[in-house]
Amino acid sequence: MKRAGIKAQVGYRGPRARKGEASIVTPNRLQRQFNPDSPDKRWVTDITYIRTREGWLYLAVVVDLFSRKVIGWSIQPRMTKEIVLNVLLMAVWRRNPQKQVLVHSDQGSQYTSYKWQSFLKSHVLEGSMSRRGNCHDNAVAESFFQLLKRERIKKRIYGTRDETRSDIFDYIEMFYNSKRRHGSSEQMPPAEYENLYYQRLRSV
């Protein structure tokens, strides 16, 4: 290519992921069953990256598949095991599930770690993982990140990490969970859809 005078096109690159061998891989128990009939039956989780002028930030979320509500989220400057544990702890603390919940992720090293698997067992959660390289197995989590980047980030580069955290908080807690309507939830925002479910349950 060099001799022919051809230059390779270099695309936009995200942060480099650390390579690590999978230690514990669980079966794909979710099997793309994205529409449970009640809250706290199936959760999905994933990580994405956000660019700032102070460096990269990593956003991890946990989404309840019933309502598409973000029930846990964490932003950290490094993609470590702690970020996924923190976000799952937030989800457990907020929801306090009374029955076993299926928690689905990809096969990233954070999720195949002993710490992740140990946390699941100690909190009566059942693990599930996408097939390697198959993003469609975790389509709802991927869809949330696409919405976030299309509706709020819009290809911008945040000035500071603090600004980023504040804006992501606003999007998730003040807009997405409480105002954004979803076709999968009768065109209601996640919080309203869950409230309606519990109202109907009490009236039975």
What are these regions (language model features)?
Residues 1-204:
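Charged DNA-binding/catalytic regions of mobile-element recombinases
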